[in-house]
């Protein structure tokens, strides 16, 4: 039986499905890979904009990475939205520990989400 290559996506979650982990899973699957995921942040967004961003605790991010790396052993890691410097440090620590064969860095930082809607910024 042929094993599909495991690709790990480390990124934010987009509830509308148009970006982040959801888009990565669709793309990896369409290309014949097996998608594993690590959520770095949860966003409230749609086609009209980003309304809120909540980072995941760094220890949860570390736990997710370790769970996937220890079991599934991905051949590649794709890194997208990283919303917090502590999460960046956590990811770097894990990359040093596991030394994946391929890393794709597709940076989406919170600063690029500066157009968070006015009502959300006031609350």
Region annotations inferred by a language model:
Residues 63, 67, 86-93, 97:
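Alpha-helical scaffolding segments of alpha/beta enzyme cores, especially the outer helices
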Residues 82, 108-110:
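Active-site beta-loop-alpha junctions enriched in small/polar residues
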Residues 1-76:
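Small-residue (G/A/S/T)-rich helix-start motifs and N-terminal tracts that mark the onset
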Residues 86, 111-114:
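Short, well-ordered, mixed-charge alpha-helical segments that flank or form enzyme active sites
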Residues 115-123:
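Single conserved hydrophobic/aromatic residue that forms the stacking wall/gate
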Residues 75-88:
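N-terminal glycine-rich "phosphate-gripper" loop used for MgATP/nucleotide binding
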């Amino acid at each position: 039986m042929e094993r599909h290559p495991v690709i790990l996506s480390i990124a934010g979650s987009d509830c509308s499905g148009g970006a982040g982990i959801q888009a990565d899973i669709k793309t990896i699957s369409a290309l014949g890979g097996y998608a594993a995921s690590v959520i770095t942040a949860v966003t409230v967004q749609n086609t009209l904009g980003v309304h809120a961003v909540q980072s995941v605790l760094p220890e949860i991010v570390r736990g997710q990475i370790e769970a996937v790396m220890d079991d599934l052993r991905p051949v590649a890691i794709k890194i997208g939205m990283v919303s917090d410097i502590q999460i960046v440090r956590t990811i770097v620590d894990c990359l040093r520990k596991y030394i994946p064969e391929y890393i794709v860095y597709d940076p989406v930082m919170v600063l690029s989400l500066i157009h968070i809607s006015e009502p959300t910024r006031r609350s």
